[in-house]
Regions:
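A basic, amphipathic helix-loop patch mediating RNA/tRNA/ribosome contacts
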Residues: 13-56
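A detector for short, charged/polar N-terminal pre-domain segments
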Residues: 1-13
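Generic structural motif recognizing short loop/turn segments at the entrances and edges of beta-strands
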Residues: 2-4, 38, 64-68
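C-terminal structural segments of small proteins and small subunits
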Residues: 49-73
Length: 73
């Protein structure tokens, strides 16, 4: 599993935007699909809200391939 850290520039970032920003998918539409299909876990729980507000301290798992830790700015 690959581990990434993401430092927030604002108070939060929407989940699908973060996935796209980190180039884990080719498009925003693909990001929305993997979230909607339940491939993303947030703090151990499946997160299907595409626009969920991701904040400092959250830990995301995208599939079984990537773990992302969110840090404050």
């Amino acid at each position: 599993m690959h581990t990434l850290e993401f430092q927030l520039q604002e108070e939060y970032i929407e989940l699908f935007k973060l996935i796209k920003l980190l180039d884990l998918v080719d498009s925003g539409a693909q990001a929305k699909l993997i979230v909607g299909d339940g491939y993303v876990r947030r703090n151990g729980e499946v997160e299907t809200r595409k626009r969920a507000k991701i904040v400092s301290g959250d830990v995301l798992e995208v599939g079984e391939e990537v773990t992302i830790t969110i840090k404050a700015r």
